[in-house]
Amino acid sequence: MDELKEVRDCCSGSWMVWGDFNLIYRAEDKSNNRLNRRMMSRFRQFINATDLQELYLKGRLFTWSNERDTPTLERLDRVFTSEDWALAFPNHELSALATECSDHAPLLLKTDCTITHCMRFRFENFWPKCEGYLQVVEEAWNAPLPWSTSDADAFRCLDFKLRNTAKMLKSWSAKRVGSVRLQLAIAKEITLRLDAAQDTRTLMPHELALRRKAKLCSLGLASLQRTLVRQRSRITFLAEGDANTRFFHLQACHRSRKGHISKLRTEETVLFREDEMADAVFQHFENMLGTRGIQNNYINFEELDLPSVGDTMFDHCFSEEEIWQAIGEMPNDKAPGPDGFTGLFFKIAWPIIKHDIMRAFQAIWALDGRSFYLVNQAYMVLLRKKNDASSIGDYRPISLIHSFAKLLTKVLARRLTSHVKKLVKQSQSAFIRTQLIHENYKAVQLSAKLLHRQKIPSALIKVDIAKAFDTVNWRFLLNLLQHLGFSRRWLDWILSSASTKVILNGSPGRRICHARGLRQEDPLSPLLFVLVMEGPNALLNLAYGRGLLRTLHPMI
């Protein structure tokens, strides 16, 4: 390692170090706890001193085995590169092959594994900085409809306007803006060559003008590039800046590689073909979301002493002010849904699109849901829960909801948030503002200490509801909301037809029409889930009131 340090100090440019290091630097790189902490620390110091980063190994945790009946497994074979190398080969892929004639797994590095998928429209946050942006949006949004006005409902018109605006923006960006990265490289090269020429001679007037123009272009294009790579990285806790641009770019490349699924394990076999994996994913989520849940036990809500919303005006007409406030809370950098638009589009173009958005909200209030399904769609992406993810259960489904549907649920969530505390007991603290979930942890700690002091044989039971959001029974939810005093209009809003397509390696699959469950990343879903959990909570309180359960202590 000392020799590698000396060589690294003398050399510049892209670096790669590949081989059997016979060392580990993390405890999880070994299958048991027999660790040499001193050597692990030295290895970490070497990695930090040489400014190298390890390439992600796809599908494997360990690369060496001692081949015993109870084997010791370790990650001894690694590939380290410099940041320059990772930027030069953003589509690389490192995998391990079978250990045929050795106790080490051979490593296979592919430097150009371009992930092909259909190109969807995505709103770029740097577009509003470009000249002519609002003019393009206004022309596209106010383009004549391809059908008569009498036949067009609000949602059909809104869907057409969003699609037409997306099409026009994509065309405008290709013609007027072009490739920001390529233009920036050209501007820098022109500046560099003119700087070199200026070292040996006086520049001509037209060369000086070109140099000034190239430098101005470099500044503007660098700003656009920072916005672009920050949006791709999905990192919101760091601001745009020259120091962070490279980090954003590396993170975006890492997200792209980590999100790719090359194989999928089912109960019967392991799938490798894209169409077979897509069918397996569709069947899994069709059974989970597209099948109505069976409610075997019915609850008499009259016995539970549940509160009522009363005259809270949950379903009054939507105002322009509350919709604008909801738009102000929409994030600018979150991954977009099927329409491709982010919250920034609504904020910048609000004077242009306001009339059609308000018309759509008025149709929702009037329960005119014709064609609402066009703007109530979502994409579902699968995020790894662990590095060696293999089956569908090893991925976390996240919904990317259509921007208008998300705006609607944001408005409804804002209305419900101020009243949800009155509808649930204090023992519920998740997803409720001004209440801390840590208080429940503290109550469990106090209970355990009290049981320990009492010396009474007892058991603390932790219940984990698998796929909690995805398996909520709609009939139970609607019966509960009706008993809580929610109007029929609110129930119709919640029951609005929704559909989802699962994204596998960048390509959307078949449509799944929802029949149960709550959508992840929907602003309204956490609040509805809290109300659902108030049912079991009220059952426990009823059992306590009838003497079937007792408290450990009056304060717990």
Please report, for each region that a protein language model flagged, where it lies by residue.
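Mobile genetic element proteins and their domesticated derivatives, centered on retroelements
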Residues: 4, 17-20, 43, 47, ...
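Metal-dependent phosphoester-hydrolase catalytic domains
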Residues: 10, 22-26, 33-135, 139, ...
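Active-site palm subdomain of RNA-directed nucleic acid polymerases
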Residues: 11-15, 415-428, 453, 532-556
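Surface-exposed loop/turn segments and immediately adjacent short secondary-structure elements
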Residues: 136, 197, 203, 233-393, ...
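Conserved polymerase palm-domain catalytic core
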Residues: 465-556
